[in-house]
Each structure stands twice: as structure tokens, then as C-alpha cells.
Amino acid sequence: MPKYRSATTTHGRNMAGARALWRATGMTDDDFGKPIIAVVNSFTQFVPGHVHLRDLGKLVAEEIEASGGVAKEFNTIAVDDGIAMGHGGMLYSLPSRELIADSVEYMVNAHCADAMVCISNCDKITPGMLMASLRLNIPVIFVSGGPMEAGKTKLSDKIIKLDLVDAMIQGANPNVSDADSDQIERSACPTCGSCSGMFTANSMNCLTEALGLSQPGNGSLLATHADRRELFLNAGRRIVALTKRYYEQDDESALPRNIASKAAFENAMTLDIAMGGSTNTVLHLLAAAQEGEIDFDISDIDRLSRLVPHLCKVAPSTPKYHMEDVHRAGGVLGILGELDRAGLMDNSVRNILGLSLRETLDRYDIMLTQDDAVKKMFRAGPAGIRTTQAFSQDTRWETLDDDRQHGCIRAREFAFSQDGGLAVLYGNLAENGCIVKTAGVDEGSLVFSGPAKVYESQDDAVAAILGGKVVAGDVVVIRYEGPKGGPGMQEMLYPTTYLKSMGLGKACALITDGRFSGGTSGLSIGHASPEAASGGTIALVKDGDIINIDIPQRGIQLDVAENELAARRLEEDARGEAAYTPHGRERQVSFALRAYATLATSADKGAVRDKSKLGG
């Protein structure tokens, strides 16, 4: 029988000092026999997806204590990728994932907590907490802040839905008036919550459901809706039961590595492909799998991407649907239900509810359930009122979207495409693979060839695009923006956004060893591995080289003879210590970022730290 970790600090005469300090936090004699459960919050006023979380940790803590546990809350950092976008702040986004994972480990291990509730939401916070959970392998439940309502405004006598990306595109479009741009900006992000499309934050919060670590509705139920309160209350109650299952009943099925097994990771990736999720999820799932010592790598993603159809199309891939529409159509379990009926799920995996996926679908898939309370929950909708308050409205859709032929979520035979929403491409330009969000690629661009326009930084590429130096047919190559070369693997949302603003969104391709925002669409290929700073072929590309992209055949090829590439590599090697560094780029890189770069691996490994360099 495992011993409560917290007993290390609460039992024995030699722990009198620790108990004295615990008493100073409000603990009593009765508390010293109870499990100590960390409430890992991420409240900050910097991020709309986290601005409403201040009191939600207390809500969870009160339920933990009412259920027989001791709750202790702490906070992690949280970077807003949208605000950090397009300047030096974006260098810090991906490295913050590692800091979050480490800070959770530090706090939980330093104080010997027995279990955790992770209150996450936005881009790097959920992945960082997920990595920590699998690293620590103690009972955990995720409950995120929830999605933002979609923006809505009236332009040209038509009501349109909006999100952050629309504000960025129209703000840079010279053909849009100042008045219209301002109206779109003011309407795009109306409430608290993670940005309203299938961007990175919402993708990851959906994936925690598929991994079995969060409750039904976690990924899609709006931040503003009163129903979301119940997820937080249930998390507080359920984590105590989960904790006691492990420590008092020796039930290892309560541990995250046994819930988020390889089969669960494959289910999660299958979901991601089916819903056309953010390409960043590839990085984060690979990183989390390594933390949990789970045998899941990019070859698994490639295999799944060839099998799974595209069943759910959401902004930024279409303006028609946002997360509120996904929820109305049954949320994550609506998609998983269609995948299960298509024979693409392992429905034996179990979750924090103690149910198998098969049992969970029977109760929570709107196409199967007879539970009126479940149907009511999935009718939770937007109120259209600007607010930063959680649980501030209780609007309901009159009906569910159960149209699996024409609706937001489709059955396999009516899929948006039989090819999934993400693909791994291989070739001499990316020998270890690169990622494209096929859900956002125009059908006419699935096969594309063009001359390279090479830039050593995102900033140079943006200047060239806005300056008219990039023309239809070009393949924009942005290199030395990988985990090591950036450092920090910046998101390239501004270059892709500005291509659209200049009318080139369907006429150009973009390839980078950096990454893309979940808000990116178009022929945008990221995560080229090995990255330029690690000697990848992308470092050898020259202006005018022809690059051939074939998504159906999963190929990406630099049309340069092998002997010419060998000569270029010798020339690059001859630069000595400057080899595989950007030519003429001036960028201030802090000590913290240099330290990150020293251990960073390429994207095909999840951009995690290279443990071999530490002897581990």
C-alpha cells in the first residue's frame, strides 16, 4: 500500500518544525491525516484566458476540503501568445512550457503534495501542467478556464463571427477602412476565455478529455457559462476520491500514466487530426509522452494521419464554426463518438471518472445518450455580453446540432475530407519530418511548387511580405527560428496573416523550422526537423531554389542535386563556430533563453530538453 507523500512532513516528532509551519497556514491536528492536494492555478491579469481564474482555485479548494482533503493553492506563470506575438516576447512562449512544468514539480515535490487539480487554459499552460503531471505521476484532474465566446459584429448589413485572427488580418489589410478595422478589433474578443477557434489552447483542452484526465465538456463549454462551475466543483470532489483510490486502495489505475496510456495518446492524436487542431499539439503531445515514458513518437502521428478523416472544421479553417458551435454539436465526445463508430478509437481506455471510453460515450455522446441533463449541458451557449466574469450567463441553444451530414461535427461518410486535418511530411528538406495543418489548406494548394524566398528571421519575412517582395507562387522559407536557433521556436502567425492581408494566402507557401499559431491557416508548414541550427537541410536553401510540396503523398523536397547540397554543406561547415547560425541577424538573446537553447531538441522530439546532455 503506498504511503501518503505528505506524511513525510506531517508525521513523526522530527517533523515538528514542518508541522508548526503547516499550522501557520491554517492546518489543524485533524488535517495531518488527510491527503494534501495541490490546487495548481494559473490566474493572471495579462491573459484573457486566465483573467477569470482568481476565485476558481478557491472554489476547487472548498470542495476538496468538504470532501475530506486539505487543499493548498499555488500559481504558475502564463504567457499570452497573442500579446507576445510579432516581437521579441514570442521567444519566451515555448520555453515557458518547461518553466511551468518545472515549477509544478518544484512546488509539489518540495511540499510532498499527494495529488493535484490543474487549473489551466491557454497555449503553454495546459501542456506545461500535463508534462508535470506525467513526470510526477500522482493523481491529477485537469479543469480549464474554458473557451471565449466568438466575437460578432455587423458589417455591410451582415452579422459575422470573428476571432483574434480576423482582427490581425483586417488590421493589416490596406483595403479595409480604419473604421471597419476598429470595429472588428473591438468585437473580436468579447469575453474571458481561451480564443474562440480551434487554436492551441482549445485544442489542448480538448485533448485532455481524450487523454482521460479531464471531465466531459472541459474542452468546449464556454468560460462564461454557469454550467462550467460544476466542472470545478466536481474536480474538487473527484480528486479526493481518486487520491484515496491510489493511496488507500493501492489502485494504480488512478495514476495519470495508467490513464493517459499509449492507447489514450493515440486516441488524443486521432481526435486532433479529426478536428484539425493546432499543429502545436504535436509538439506538446510528444513532450508529454516523453515525460510519462510513453512510447509515442512522430511515426505514430504520421501513421494516424493517414487513417483519420477530417470530421470537425472550426475557425481558423472556416469562419462558420467556433468552439461554442463544437459544444452545441456534442463537444469532444461528439467527435470521439463518430470516430468510435468509424472504428478508429480504443474504447477500452479509462478516465478520471473511472469509466471506459465506451461507457463515457454511452452517457455523454449526444447521439447515444438518454440523459436529459447531458443534453441540457451541451445546449449551453453564448450570451453575447462583454464580460471578464466566469459563470456569468446561462443562455441555452434551443436545439442541439446533431446533423452529422451537414453540421459542425460529421459522421465519417460525410467527412469534410477523408484525409485528416494534420499531416506529417518527409523529404530532403525535413528528413525527420515537418507538420502541416491540412484542415486550413485550400484544395488547390495541396500540391505546390515554387521558388524559395529565404529569410533568416520572422521579422525579415514580415518586412518582405508587407513590402511587396513576396509574390504569387513563392515559397517563403523562414529559418533559424527553431527551438535552438530562435531560440524559443517562435510562432509565425504574423507572416501567414500578412500573406492573407496582401491577397497571397492561397498563392504562396511558407516553410519554417519555427512553429505556427493555432490561428494559422493556409499552406503553412512548420517544425522542419532537423532545424537549421542543428544542421538541417533548411539551412542550405538559397533564393530561387525550387521546393516541391505534395501533401497527398506526404512529401516535401528541395529540388537541388545531392552534389550541390554536399558542396553547400562544406561551405557552411567552413564558417567554423558561426556555422548553422543566421547570416547578419541582430537579435538580443537573454541568458535565460541561451540556457534554454543549450538543451533544446528539434521539433520532432517535442522541443523538449536533451536529457543526454545532463547524463540522464
UniProtKB/Swiss-Prot annotation:
Instruction: Tell whether Nucleotidyltransferase is among the UniProt keywords.
Output: no
Cofactor: bound how, per the entry note?
A: Binds 1 [2Fe-2S] cluster per subunit. This cluster acts as a Lewis acid cofactor.
Q: What UniProt keywords are attached to this protein's entry? A: 2Fe-2S, Amino-acid biosynthesis, Branched-chain amino acid biosynthesis, Iron, Iron-sulfur, Lyase, Magnesium, Metal-binding
**What pathway does this protein act in?**
Amino-acid biosynthesis; L-isoleucine biosynthesis; L-isoleucine from 2-oxobutanoate: step 3/4; Amino-acid biosynthesis; L-valine biosynthesis; L-valine from pyruvate: step 3/4
Requisite cofactors = [2Fe-2S] cluster; Mg(2+)
Q: Which residues carry this modification: N6-carboxylysine?
A: K124
Cite a GO CC annotation. Answer: cytosol
Biological function:
Functions in the biosynthesis of branched-chain amino acids. Catalyzes the dehydration of (2R,3R)-2,3-dihydroxy-3-methylpentanoate (2,3-dihydroxy-3-methylvalerate) into 2-oxo-3-methylpentanoate (2-oxo-3-methylvalerate) and of (2R)-2,3-dihydroxy-3-methylbutanoate (2,3-dihydroxyisovalerate) into 2-oxo-3-methylbutanoate (2-oxoisovalerate), the penultimate precursor to L-isoleucine and L-valine, respectively.
Matching entries from NCBIfam families are given as:
ilvD, PRK12448.1
Name this polypeptide is given: Dihydroxy-acid dehydratase
Please report the organism this UniProt entry assigns to the protein. Erwinia tasmaniensis (strain DSM 17950 / CFBP 7177 / CIP 109463 / NCPPB 4357 / Et1/99)
What is the taxonomic lineage of the source species?
Bacteria, Pseudomonadati, Pseudomonadota, Gammaproteobacteria, Enterobacterales
Identify the gene encoding this protein: ilvD
